[in-house]
């Protein structure tokens, strides 16, 4: 799939939504698999080939502009759907991280606790709208402010942490929304 402009179907990016959740909903809306969306985002062009490493933490500026171009969402909102929203030391400090240089991740994780991979979830929120909230990625988040329930950290079926995918920022397949 190759495109230079907007994708035909563009769901709105919810203000509390994480970028990977939005991109997976975008894939479903356009009949694409998450790997196809990633290829659209990282394909080489005259402006360069954006990297998807650290996309949920501190994304490559090229990938932010590519997402904005394909979705019509402004770049600031795209960046705000990543952990950059929580930068400036409260609760994260991402200054040492360069998304184009993998080894710089060490500068960030040595500061103490850090949400490396995965997410918690509020089962009630997810059942309502299928949107994965960015705040659920923060280890200090324990309850859902909307429902007043504890966040769930692991799948009761398989025992794994949710949204743990070290080698791809998106899940390999998405289940269509009801």
Where are the regions a protein language model picked out?
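A structured, charge-rich N-terminal accessory region that forms the first stable segment of a protein
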Residues: 1-117, 123, 130
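Domain-exit/linker segments immediately C-terminal to small folded modules
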Residues: 6, 149-178
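Residue-level signal for alpha-helical context at structural boundaries
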Residues: 41-44, 85, 140, 162, ...
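Short alpha-helix boundary/capping motifs
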Residues: 51-55, 95, 144, 150, ...
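Short, glycine/acidic-rich beta->alpha junctions
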Residues: 59, 135-136, 146-147
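Short Cys/His-rich Zn2+-coordinating modules
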Residues: 97-110, 124-129, 135-142, 159-167
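Processing junctions and N-termini across compartments
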Residues: 116-119, 138, 149-152
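Short, cysteine/histidine-rich loop/knuckle motifs that typically chelate Zn2+
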Residues: 121-125, 143-146, 157, 178
């Amino acid at each position: 799939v190759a495109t230079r402009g907007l994708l035909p179907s563009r769901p709105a990016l919810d203000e509390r939504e994480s970028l990977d959740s939005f991109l997976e909903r975008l894939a479903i809306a356009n009949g694409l698999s998450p790997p196809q969306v990633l290829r659209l985002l990282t394909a080489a062009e005259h402006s360069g080939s954006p990297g998807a490493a650290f996309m949920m933490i501190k994304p490559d500026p090229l990938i932010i502009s590519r997402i904005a171009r394909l979705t019509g969402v402004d770049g600031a909102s795209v960046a705000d759907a990543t952990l950059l929203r929580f930068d400036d030391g409260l609760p994260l400090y991402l200054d040492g991280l360069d998304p184009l240089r993998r080894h710089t991740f060490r500068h960030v994780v040595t500061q103490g606790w850090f949400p490396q991979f995965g997410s918690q979830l509020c089962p009630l929120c997810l059942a309502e709208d299928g949107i994965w909230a960015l705040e659920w990625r923060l280890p200090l988040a324990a309850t859902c402010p909307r429902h007043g329930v504890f966040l769930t950290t692991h799948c009761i079926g398989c025992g794994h942490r949710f949204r743990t995918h070290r080698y791809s920022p998106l899940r390999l397949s998405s289940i269509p929304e009801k």
